[in-house]
Amino acid sequence: MFFMSTVTVTVPATTANIGPGFDCIGAALTLYNQFTFTEQPEADTDLRITVTGTEAHRVSGDRTNLLYQAFTHLYDHLNKTPPKIAIDIKLGVPLARGLGSSATAIIGGLVGANELAGQPLSTAEIMELAIAIEGHPDNVVPALLGNCQLSVGEAENWEICQIPWHSDIIPVVAIPDFELSTEEARAVLPKTLSYGDAIFNIARMGLLIRALESGNEQWLNKAMADKLHQPYRQGLIEGYEFVQASALKAGAYGMVISGAGPTLLALTHPEKIQSVEKAMKNAWTQLEIVADVRSLSIDTQGANVNAH
């Protein structure tokens, strides 16, 4: 069996929930982190991590690094000793912004380790390990597989369904210059929910799937509403209602919190991209908040491996 000594794994950012699909729907976006793993059997140390990118100084360079923890987790799963490794990280996905940066690290570490170990695990097995590490599937599944994915199941029994995404639906992300941790965003959620709120989301979840597939503007506008998590989280994001109103006025189908936030995701028609981008950026500018606003596409490849 041929073992590669160097492998590069490119993993897309993801946007999770898309309104009513709390903890079960996510889509891969054309924004990436890149991880290069090089075995160094003669090195003096077991681990060397180099990070480049605008937030490189915030990424751990030791064994606490999530990427390395995922990397070693796969070897532990195989009952093998991890190799001495040099890891080069190129950051393109903002940290703690609701765009699945942790999922890129988990998928990157697992896929990189699997490649260097000789591909002993299937994609499905890697996915199960990733879900177990992350605790929920909505980011790691599309990060691994690409496209928009619905994940249903528990423990090691998962059914994954790709949701078709109509070409007339363009994601626009507004990434503010402040952070919101997933832990903080989950802490504000209630312990119990009413039947009415559950039914509200069940109905819109079904409509969301059909709206994404068909591109029906009216359906999409109604389907992006939610009562399970967004009403409790939007207070953590300064300017949420103002940015949302501005996006809708500019022609967006709807706007939601991307993952746990604070990034806001608008979906719009291709002809409205510029007006929606401008409206969302101007709204936050009026509140003296700097935001990176850009349109993206749906990534269809997922984690991409290049051995060299």
Swiss-Prot record:
Q: Primary place of residence?
A: cytoplasm
Q: What class of enzyme is it?
A: transferase
Instruction: Cite the InterPro entries for this sequence.
Output: GHMP_kinase_C_dom (IPR013750), GHMP_kinase_C_sf (IPR036554), GHMP_kinase_N_dom (IPR006204), GHMP_knse_ATP-bd_CS (IPR006203), Homoserine_kinase (IPR000870), Ribosomal_Su5_D2-typ_SF (IPR020568), Ribsml_uS5_D2-typ_fold_subgr (IPR014721)
| Gene Ontology cellular-component annotations | cytoplasm
Gene Ontology process terms (BP): threonine biosynthetic process
Residues engaged in binding ATP:
94-104
Q: Which Gene3D superfamilies match?
A: 3.30.230.10, GHMP kinase, C-terminal domain (3.30.70.890)
Q: What GO annotations for molecular function exist for this entry?
A: ATP binding; homoserine kinase activity
User: Could you tell me the superkingdom of the organism this chain comes from?
Assistant: Bacteria
Keywords from UniProt, A to Z, are: Amino-acid biosynthesis, ATP-binding, Cytoplasm, Kinase, Nucleotide-binding, Threonine biosynthesis, Transferase
SUPFAM superfamilies per the UniProt record, alphabetical = GHMP Kinase, C-terminal domain, Ribosomal protein S5 domain 2-like
Annotated compartments: Cytoplasm
EC number(s) on file: 2.7.1.39
Annotated pathway: Amino-acid biosynthesis; L-threonine biosynthesis; L-threonine from L-aspartate: step 4/5
Which reaction(s) are listed as its catalytic activity?
A: L-homoserine + ATP = O-phospho-L-homoserine + ADP + H(+)
Q: What does this protein do?
A: Catalyzes the ATP-dependent phosphorylation of L-homoserine to L-homoserine phosphate.
Q: Which family does it belong to?
A: Belongs to the GHMP kinase family. Homoserine kinase subfamily.
Task: Enumerate the HAMAP family for this protein.
Answer: Homoser_kinase (MF_00384)
Report the protein name in the record: Homoserine kinase
